[in-house]
């Protein structure tokens, strides 16, 4: 998914989930060392994968999987939430980019 498409998708998705414009976005550029496994806790937020990563990187979360090296999946997920595992299977460092979407936690009165 391109960054432009993600930035177009995010407002619609957040509206769909009932947050309207009550969220923050953060651009995240992760560098994974050779063989590194990174674990992210994203239970109350979303990570939108942008700029397709190398085939040697896999992203597995409660929402789905993005892993071009795994031939048995018929769908690659770009939206991730919950516990996210990011694995660099390569023998060299690799880069991965996400847009992190963090809903604002507002009082009930403020949501109206």
Features from the language model and the residues they span:
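C-terminal interaction-tip segments
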Residues: 2-27, 90-112
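Short, surface-exposed beta-strand/strand-loop-strand elements in extracellular ectodomains
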Residues: 50-67, 96-101
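Short, solvent-exposed S/T- and G/P-enriched segments that are highly enriched in secreted/extracellular
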Residues: 26, 30-38, 62-78
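Short, surface-exposed linear segments at secondary-structure transitions and domain or protein termini
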Residues: 75-80, 106-108
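Beta-rich globular "head" domains
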Residues: 21-58
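Generic cytosolic/nucleocytoplasmic N-terminal low-complexity/intrinsically disordered segments
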Residues: 20, 71, 86-87
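Noncatalytic modules at the cell exterior or secretory-pathway interfaces
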Residues: 43-48, 78-99
């Amino acid at each position: 998914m391109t960054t432009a498409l993600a930035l177009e998708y995010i407002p619609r998705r957040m509206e769909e989930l009932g947050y309207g414009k009550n969220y923050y976005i953060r651009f995240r550029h992760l560098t994974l060392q050779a063989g590194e496994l990174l674990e992210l806790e994203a239970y109350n937020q979303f990570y939108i994968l942008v700029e397709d990563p190398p085939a040697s990187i896999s992203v597995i979360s409660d929402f789905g999987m993005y892993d071009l090296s795994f031939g048995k999946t018929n769908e690659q997920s770009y939206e991730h939430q919950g516990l996210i595992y990011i694995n660099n299977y390569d023998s060299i460092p690799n880069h991965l980019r996400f847009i992190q979407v963090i809903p604002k936690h507002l009082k009930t009165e403020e949501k109206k």
